Amino acid sequence: MKKHLAGLLTLLFLAVGLTVQAGDDNDKEVKIKTSAICSMCKERIERNLAFEKGVKESNLDLKDKVVTVKYNPKKTDVAKIKANISKTGYDADEVTADEKGYAKLPSCCKKGGHH
């Protein structure tokens, strides 16, 4: 009986481990054009995306102004990610920057501003 129980527990742990592992394969990636200008913009966008449920990682390329976001589609979607960027004060593809978020940006991070 103990051997059967130990065998069942081993199978259970393996099945759970494989399920957790398989979840990583289902992550998606999206590239979003932003209105970011400087390293402060990059830091602000990446930091706020880190708090978005389901976002695994983000990286903003300042040269292209494109943020690449890896996310779990079961926990978030592209619309929520764009809304997060907008609320932070930046354009996100066709979604324009939220006025309140934009007003909070330092002048160097606003359109036409430079470091």
Model features per residue range: what roles?
Residues 1-26:
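Bacterial Sec-dependent N-terminal signal peptides
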Residues 24-115:
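Mature soluble domains of exported/periplasmic/lumenal proteins and thiol-rich metal-chelating peptides
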